């Protein structure tokens, strides 16, 4: 060991001496004595390794307390961090899908802080059913006879099939054998539920007679699956639920539908593309309809099944129902969200998902122009900051081919180097409230459709 190396080792402080420093008192109060000591030992090992490998001290050795504070602050951050979603995808699966209405947030907070009547009947002090209050709301909104709630729509489809068709055949059009994110495939779900898939028709064309010829003594269900995350166009043919229900009645086979996104309002009244609604399918006579709570409905993650009372009863009594049931926070948020639908005139204001989807391109354009000047002043030395038209998407497999006119702030490096865009995007992801955009066509795009808190946005980007 050289004299220089010995000198560097001698400059490493003892842990006891560091802990006596006043700057470590608050760190010990905040993070605990044990964790601070563990980290200091780790940092001393790191420093010795740096000395051994490069004959120098780490830069942070000049201020141990500052480095400990920085590391422990980062360590204490929640894995679920709030972000500013400027990707242009409103219902972004990786960012948690639907934002919750204030009424839902308040309802969840109350449910978390107090015992609630989850399965308790106040009228007779007996055991109640956790789905009852929501079932009444859903029946009022959709016209169904009864309803069942589980933890997501994949679970809803699994329960629907397992409870009504296990050991039997389910007839589905070949063009509706969907796969959604996470490799959720209808054929796989059927196998898991104990059903036999009987696919009919071709990828692009399925006729009523295809279903008719497939039905036999072992057929349990005729199933429709809404292709919410892709579209087959051109020379196509599919029969709708009403026609399939008529065929099912003739053959004495019930019809069920996996609707996927499941909007409870006609989106076309807001200038958005129309999506099938559960109440339309119930009116057509479909026995069971499943859909998501956290997509177009704008609530928490949940799987909702509405339909005929005797069919719902089979779901409620199936052993899988307990394994898949929703917890009290989910039910509280979903109930509060559904109550907003009882006042449709205020829905676009109080439901964040609908509010963001219905923002006009003109309003977003004005917002972008308002924000351009301060951002150009801050980033102008390295990037050209411009306002550009763009197209948002709904996301989460909802209306996959439809786009919403929007406006974006774009950042283009003066030197044209893509690495500068990657570096800028990485810097923004490290902010206290990360700002998430997307890199496309030599620019970093910030689609402002989902930006409602301009002040927080500027505070982050002008740091």
Curated annotation (Swiss-Prot):
SUPFAM superfamilies, A to Z: PLP-dependent transferases (SSF53383)
Cofactor needs: pyridoxal 5'-phosphate
Keyword terms of this UniProt record: Cytoplasm, Protein biosynthesis, Pyridoxal phosphate, Selenium, Transferase
Pfam family for this entry, one: SelA
EC number: 2.9.1.1
TM annotation in the entry: none
Subcellular location: Cytoplasm
Listed GO MF terms: L-seryl-tRNA(Sec) selenium transferase activity
Pathway given in the UniProt record: Aminoacyl-tRNA biosynthesis; selenocysteinyl-tRNA(Sec) biosynthesis; selenocysteinyl-tRNA(Sec) from L-seryl-tRNA(Sec) (bacterial route): step 1/1
Modified residues (N6-(pyridoxal phosphate)lysine): 295
Catalytic activity: L-seryl-tRNA(Sec) + selenophosphate + H(+) = L-selenocysteinyl-tRNA(Sec) + phosphate
Principal cellular location given in the protein's record: cytoplasm
Gene Ontology annotations for the cellular component aspect, listed alphabetically: cytoplasm
Single biological process term from Gene Ontology: conversion of seryl-tRNAsec to selenocys-tRNAsec
Class of the enzyme per the UniProt entry, highest EC level: transferase
Function: Converts seryl-tRNA(Sec) to selenocysteinyl-tRNA(Sec) required for selenoprotein biosynthesis.
HAMAP family found in the cross-reference section: SelA (MF_00423)
Family, as annotated: Belongs to the SelA family.
Subunit structure: Homodecamer; pentamer of dimers. Binds only one seryl-tRNA(Sec) per dimer.
Protein name: L-seryl-tRNA(Sec) selenium transferase
Record organism: Escherichia coli O1:K1 / APEC
């Amino acid at each position: 060991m050289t004299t220089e190396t010995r000198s560097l080792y001698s400059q490493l402080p003892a842990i006891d001496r560091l802990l006596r420093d006043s700057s470590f008192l608050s760190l010990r109060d905040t993070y605990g004595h044990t964790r601070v000591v563990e980290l200091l030992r780790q940092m001393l090992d790191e420093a010795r390794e740096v000395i051994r490998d490069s004959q120098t001290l780490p830069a942070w050795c000049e201020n141990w307390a500052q480095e400990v504070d920085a590391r422990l602050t980062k360590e204490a951050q929640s894995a679920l961090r709030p972000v500013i979603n400027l990707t242009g995808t409103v219902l972004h699966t990786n960012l948690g899908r639907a934002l919750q209405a204030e009424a839902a947030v308040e309802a969840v907070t109350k449910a978390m802080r107090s015992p609630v009547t989850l399965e308790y009947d106040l009228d007779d002090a007996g055991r109640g059913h956790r789905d009852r209050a929501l079932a009444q709301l859903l029946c009022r909104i959709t016209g169904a006879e009864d309803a069942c709630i589980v933890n997501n729509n994949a679970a809803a489809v699994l329960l629907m099939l397992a409870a009504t068709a296990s050991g039997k055949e389910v007839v589905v059009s070949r063009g509706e054998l969907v796969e959604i994110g996470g490799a959720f495939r209808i054929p796989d779900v059927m196998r898991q539920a104990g059903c036999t898939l009987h696919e009919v028709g071709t990828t692009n064309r399925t006729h009523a007679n295809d279903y008719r010829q497939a039905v036999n003594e072992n057929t349990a269900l005729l199933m429709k699956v809404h292709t919410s995350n892709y579209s087959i166009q051109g020379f196509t043919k599919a029969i709708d639920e009403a026609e399939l229900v008529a065929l099912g009645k003739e053959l004495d086979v019930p019809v069920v539908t996996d609707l996927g996104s499941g909007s409870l309002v006609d989106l076309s009244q807001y200038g958005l593309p129309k999506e099938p609604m559960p109440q339309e399918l119930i009116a057509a006579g479909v026995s069971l309809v499943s859909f998501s709570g956290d997509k177009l409905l704008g609530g928490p993650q949940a799987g909702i099944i509405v339909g005929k009372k005797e069919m719902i009863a089979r779901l409620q009594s199936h052993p899988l129902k307990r394994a898949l049931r929703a917890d009290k926070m989910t039910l509280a948020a979903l109930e509060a969200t559904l109550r907003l639908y009882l006042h449709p005139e205020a829905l676009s204001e109080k439901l964040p998902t609908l509010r963001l989807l219905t923002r006009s391109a003109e309003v977003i354009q004005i917002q972008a122009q308002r924000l351009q000047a301060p951002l150009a002043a801050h980033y102008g030395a390295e990037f050209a900051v411009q306002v550009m038209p763009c197209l948002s998407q709904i996301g989460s497999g909802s209306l996959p081919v439809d786009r919403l006119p929007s406006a974006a702030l774009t950042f283009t490096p003066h030197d044209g180097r893509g690495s500068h865009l990657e570096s800028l995007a990485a810097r923004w992801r490290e902010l206290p409230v990360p700002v998430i955009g997307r890199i496309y066509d030599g620019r970093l795009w910030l689609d402002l459709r989902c930006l409602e808190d301009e002040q927080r946005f500027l505070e982050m980007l002008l740091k």
